[in-house]
């Protein structure tokens, strides 16, 4: 169907790739919507094969759902109780309409000409998906990382539709550091457009800029192998340490499973994200949980404390907890056991 974007532009033949886990109750009110992180996907839990997904970029990281440790029968988000929905973002590269889709006016892929998509566009498209799935109301909306920003804004758009909000390693606005990191990555990707088919190398570099905020320095040091993998002639005078090799490897793995055009589309939406503080008053009837990770250097703990203070100023019913982890921002992907009690008790 046709979809009108925040910008006023129209997208034709919009498709949203999604997965569901569990069963919708007869009262249609046991659903949980999960917004994924920047480079995540709708493939939330369980196992996946490239043969079943021939039209999307792929590597072995996609063979297991990105939140498989959290979602499933008798897991933290128990699919014996809940109907869990996760959708790939509009503008993404995992099956939803995005830069890899065909532009009807040219019969070619949109590429970098794909229209600007706001986070609000993504949220509205996912509400349309929930309507299609016949979901009457949501027991919870959950979002880690930038998914937490979308989960929050979703609740301000549809406050009567949501019972609970869970924001994990996220916040309510961009920090100065995030704004600058996004600019750096966008500039790198823009250079890649004019680089004679080297745009994947530029995507790899953009990923390295971001990746160092996803893990703690301690984890980076522990993960880096003792031997180096690269000839130091590649970048003269560099790549002699395992930490450098580790970051190069992360960038190279990433370009197997993502596209520069979708990466730029989503960080552009992030860069232009803004919630007016008065809109937070709409959360009055929504129970809210804010989870911080003490070693997070993407969304720093101080940002969650600021978020909590703003919610308290608006008299929003909010619980707050800090996870103690050495793994940084990516703790929400790697350590379900640390989140288990908090999430189960809140749900």
Model-found features: residue ranges?
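Conserved hydrolase catalytic core segment
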Residues: 137-176
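Catalytic active-site module of serine/aspartate enzymes centered on a nucleophile-bearing elbow/loop
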Residues: 305-308, 312-347
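Alpha/beta-hydrolase-fold enzymes
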Residues: 161-162, 166-253
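Short beta-strand/loop motif that positions the catalytic acidic residue
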Residues: 290-292
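Conserved acidic catalytic loop of the alpha/beta-hydrolase fold
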Residues: 109, 113, 120-140
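Conserved alpha/beta-hydrolase "acid-adjacent" motif
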Residues: 297-303
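N-terminal cap/lid subdomain of alpha/beta-hydrolase-fold enzymes
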Residues: 19, 23, 27-100
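Active-site nucleophile elbow and catalytic-triad environment of alpha/beta-hydrolase enzymes
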Residues: 249-250, 262-280
């Amino acid at each position: 169907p046709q979809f009108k974007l925040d910008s006023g532009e129209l997208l034709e033949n919009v498709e949203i790739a999604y997965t569901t886990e569990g069963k919708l109750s007869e009262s249609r009110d046991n659903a949980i919507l999960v917004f994924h992180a920047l480079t995540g996907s709708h493939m939330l839990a369980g196992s996946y094969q490239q043969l079943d997904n021939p039209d999307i970029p792929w590597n072995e990281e996609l063979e297991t759902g990105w939140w498989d440790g959290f979602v499933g029968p008798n897991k933290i988000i128990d699919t014996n109780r809940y109907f869990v929905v996760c959708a790939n973002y509009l503008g993404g590269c995992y099956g939803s309409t995005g830069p890899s889709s065909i532009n009807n006016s040219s019969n070619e892929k949109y590429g970098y000409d794909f229209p600007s998509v706001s986070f609000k566009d993504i949220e509205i498209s996912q509400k349309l998906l929930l309507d299609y799935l016949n979901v009457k109301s949501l027991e919870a909306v959950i979002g880690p990382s930038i998914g937490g920003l979308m989960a929050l804004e979703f609740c301000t758009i549809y406050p009567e539709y949501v019972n609970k909000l869970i924001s994990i390693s996220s916040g309510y606005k961009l920090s100065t550091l995030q704004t600058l990191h996004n600019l750096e990555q966008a500039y790198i990707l823009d250079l890649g457009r004019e680089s004679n088919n080297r745009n994947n190398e530029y995507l790899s570099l953009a990923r390295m800029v971001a990746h160092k905020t996803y893990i703690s320095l301690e984890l980076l040091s522990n993960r880096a192998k003792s031997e180096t993998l690269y000839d130091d002639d590649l970048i003269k005078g560099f790549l002699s340490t395992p930490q450098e090799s580790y970051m190069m490897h992360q960038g190279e793995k990433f370009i197997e499973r993502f596209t520069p055009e979708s990466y730029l589309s989503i960080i552009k939406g992030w860069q232009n994200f803004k919630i007016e503080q008065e809109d937070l008053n709409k959360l009055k009837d929504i129970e809210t949980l804010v989870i911080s990770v003490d070693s997070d250097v993407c969304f720093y703990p101080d940002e969650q404390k600021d978020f909590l203070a703003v919610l308290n100023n608006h008299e929003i019913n909010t619980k707050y907890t800090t996870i103690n982890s050495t793994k940084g921002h990516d703790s929400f992907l790697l350590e379900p056991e640390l989140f288990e009690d908090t999430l189960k008790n809140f749900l």
